[in-house]
């Protein structure tokens, strides 16, 4: 039936049509998260109860999933079990089919196209017969279709099972054969282009396991598949999975489990993993597959989800002979480099080192549950970013789950409780009846082969070579080289020289306000067309400074070995600790045992840019030939002894990308590494681009030469001698530059949530703005370029233009300064130019329409700067009278200001903005940092001069004004987030990212932390405050859903908004946010302002809001989610025209940041980050704040102008309101009057050729539905106790489905009494397993006690009261190391007490401000970013204690004498308890802990106090170094014995 040759040679683009995901959308537009777990009987006793327990566990994690637009079709639920042979035998009796359980029988679980059953089954049967497998029969799976949601029902496949048998193969060999069968079936369907391919999917084909899954809610799975509740359906294990997808169209194959794994999380490095897997395929050889290995290819598929591709990689390794544990260790390795637990197990480190040269990690937050039917296990990602709790029972069950309490276990039956830490694994071998912990698994796997010896034989570690100590060219030649390669004066002075001096990237402010590179009239180097992507919502960014233990820039170069080799041999290779190498190190690589060749990237200008493409293709041929000649290091070099006007360098990024993809296509990519020796690489963004498109290392020889010249400059030496620059020698200057680049690279990796350079390498995690398909397909295939742009000839022309400037007849003594960063007359156009600012100030200071018209004209007649400048309005309606248009009051209600924090801004500015917005009925945004409760009051004491005793520092006030920000922001630092703050908001904004620095945190310098700011932020004056890059309670989409739930819980009247930054794929993220119950989604553009950000982030991260807004609006509309949310946009909005254009693209509300500040008095000095703002807008210095002249009326006037302009445009279009034009894309057309300098290839289809969907406008606030707090509040005694401030005690049972308990009570108390005014006492006792966020935002006067256990986020944001958690009565553990609460507890707490008789998970007390707590063990990153409070840990601690901790104290009991190695000593120091005050503080907390929990550990310590006290360490940040508790000098008593 098959032409085997054709099948074997099936092109990848055809085989990608296979259903294994033919129905799946692009990997860039698919995200998911989930709840996952397994139950396994260690003794391999099969029973129906395990299946039922798995189904019940699924139901208990329903809140971790989501539903489609019909609110009934689940995103996916499923289970994997052993094959229920008894059920199948009885079911097939009527077909006279018999087989024994131990026979070599395989079962396939199939989704088939209902209208092509015969054809699809014939293909399956034909392949089985070709592989000499006997077809026993078919079984129609009994289902109940009526229980499905509408969308799931309409897309439901035909579900049937096939049974096959081998007469001569063992079960293990048959399992491998079935893998081959499935790949052949999929390949055949793909190559023949079956139009039903998207309806065909093989859930499982195995003789050990079977998968039941579909697009349904948890509770529906067992109702739909009748088998699952059949008493004969027995299994000794079950894996279960509930999916939360950002994409909402039902896709049955996307439900999990996959065939081997169930995955909760996201693989950030997917595109790179897929590229490298494709490049690895030619090397794959295996004794298992022999000459049939080609039939398994392609291994992965770019059209599949990350989970499906990870499953495919795992499946390959397992089917080729690896154990499941080893397969996951290879693909998802632990962060072994800084693991003290491996200090005495070098074989484990050797294993990971060995495979780091063969397989780049699949990196990202992930809990991966896996099975091959014999071993069931789970592993966690290297950062521990997903929860994983386990229970081992006395009757030999092992239960692992995303949450504790999903499977009911009697307390007396619990043997132990624990959690998986970062990179850890647990497995159950049901055939040998063993439970293996992390160390046992990894020791077993790694001791089989002497990996250390293999490394010693094959690996060379590149030693550091000294930097050059002399200049290599004179200043004239240097300037000519710099000019030829595109350097400007700003690149040298602001970037390279700053990095050489300070060893860090330059910081800038106020955002990017110049034209996009493709719109600019000035030439740009190729890197400027690339925008870095970043993590938001579906996975977290990482802090590369505070969590450096999981980060690495190491990379290995040379020929790669065969990943499937069962007797590993390692090719010769070199390990680089950094991809940034100097000239000496490059020479050392040439002198190594590897075969290296330098390939010149210069081309002759014979035909001008016309031969540009041919020259690049020739370069690619040269590269492949070099490999065929035996070279395994290719150095692409633009270095030339003499600069020649007729020899132009191919841009190194273009050269690298083209060669990289050419070698992949030729099957040669694994044979060699690409290095780059280039002059055109100096900023961190340049390095990131080169590495992202395949370069393993870069020698930036001209950047180093520039640093040498800077150091040699007499001016530099003079500044050093006067102490105005740090002193260094010429080699240190180059080392500083390299250090700055490396730090910047780590930040770029980490903003995407990637830890390892080897995972970023070749991952192409960029978005292109301004390159056409010809360029992209040649060198950057797989990268999105939404708007098209330069052709090869046009790119060649720009390259030549840059080069030719070096040979201009005009001679200058300085490099050209085009003003790309700082405004300069005659330079690049800046929207925020002095002329514009002056016109705006004149207009708003007195409401002067003439000046506003001038302002408006300046912006309307500007050069094309943003994408919207290429559009114009059209309407088929006749103009109407402006009197028919909605009132200006209605329009003003749609306006907001951006989230600018009090701390970054002065108090005067912040309050003036809020008052102005409240006057017009708009909304100001508090930003991060809290708000003074005095601002919640309405002013009624304003005198005739416009001042008020309540706010005496403000001018221009009126009675009735209020300075309260309507929008209160919740950012990653949680500074000032208290119950009272949250209750005084009309909206609560979760800031996921910021336009000017997406994927990054922030730091408010100590000089901006005045006593007033410190009071609001619950910290100490003068101490720097760090906002983490991620929210530590948002590592996935279901985590965001939980925070939205928390905020709806405390303030059910406030709308919840989620702020995202525009990037490719934002539409699917927004879909997840909408399904997570958000009320508002805000899309910020890349050009938003900021108080401080790395310059490379301002310039090279994020994309225009026009693209993001259009994508979000379209996708939500297409998936019937548009009516669930309001869309808001911000980023560079300045005129009424901007508002109308944004509305047409889908926006309903509009945010103003920079321009609002200008209207209020900002003069764009662009020194916000220095605390030296000359007009008092962005400073905390009192003498500068006194200069602030702004009044609310100025901003009111600005918005009146904007509102009137909107009304005029609406009238001219013939529309009566903004609502009437929202999403009406037909009103936009391309402005053909604009001719761009560089290209006519811009494509605006994503903005103008869109279906005009209709939807019901969303106005209400989403609710959480029935919650436990409402039941508690419904009890009269409770409501009376709140009203009368009396004391009451109540008792309740609790389950993991009861989330955020105690929070709504706290909101009511805070609303009525503030944070501290309640005098009553409400005691609530709970029994069972509490859901997430137990006691979140707890208010003073509420004491919660839990007899049981709790999940993540206990005490998050608590402000008062107490939380006590103890094991349930009757619990007897075999050891004292029991986990009782989850991850990220006490996050952002501003007060209160927490006592937990057991261990906590990762990131305990992260960003704690004032809470005090005692626990009996913690995971990694305890006390991270802590600014106050006291923490006591009476047990083991994980790694990285005290990272970023700037305040508060912590005490750790160190019985194992290993605590010192677990502390991050960058900021804190540790010491013994050396003062009486410190001893009393510690002892008092332990006494409280003993009294409240009955802790045996606490009682033992107190009884033997004198012997235990010397075993405690005190963790002390600098701000606490001179207080009674830490310093004998300040304490009346010291402890002599210590």
Swiss-Prot record:
EC numbers, comma separated: 1.4.7.1
Gene Ontology CC entries for this record: chloroplast stroma
Keywords: 3Fe-4S, Amino-acid biosynthesis, Chloroplast, FAD, Flavoprotein, FMN, Glutamate biosynthesis, Glutamine amidotransferase, Iron, Iron-sulfur, Metal-binding, Oxidoreductase, Plastid
Sequence ranges assigned to domain Glutamine amidotransferase type-2 in this UniProt record: 34-431
Cofactor (UniProt): [3Fe-4S] cluster; FAD; FMN
Record: residues binding [3Fe-4S] cluster: 1162, 1168, 1173
Free-text cofactor note: Binds 1 [3Fe-4S] cluster.
Binding-site list for FMN: 1109-1166
UniProt keyword DNA repair present: no
Active site: 34 (for gatase activity)
Pathway membership: Amino-acid biosynthesis; L-glutamate biosynthesis via GLT pathway; L-glutamate from 2-oxoglutarate and L-glutamine (ferredoxin route): step 1/1; Energy metabolism; nitrogen metabolism
Location in the cell: Plastid, Chloroplast stroma
One GO biological process term: ammonia assimilation cycle
Reactions mediated catalytically: 2 oxidized [2Fe-2S]-[ferredoxin] + 2 L-glutamate = L-glutamine + 2 reduced [2Fe-2S]-[ferredoxin] + 2-oxoglutarate + 2 H(+)
Gene Ontology terms for molecular function: 3 iron, 4 sulfur cluster binding; glutamate synthase (ferredoxin) activity; metal ion binding
Broad class of the protein's primary localization: plastid
UniProt xrefs under InterPro entries: Aldolase_TIM (IPR013785), ET-N_metabolism_enzyme (IPR050711), GATase_2_dom (IPR017932), Glu_synth_asu_C (IPR002489), Glu_synth_asu_C_sf (IPR036485), Glu_synth_centr_N (IPR006982), Glu_synthdom (IPR002932), Ntn_hydrolases_N (IPR029055)
SUPFAM superfamilies noted in UniProt: Alpha subunit of glutamate synthase, C-terminal domain, FMN-linked oxidoreductases, N-terminal nucleophile aminohydrolases (Ntn hydrolases)
Family: Belongs to the glutamate synthase family.
Subunit structure: Monomer.
Protein's recorded name: Ferredoxin-dependent glutamate synthase
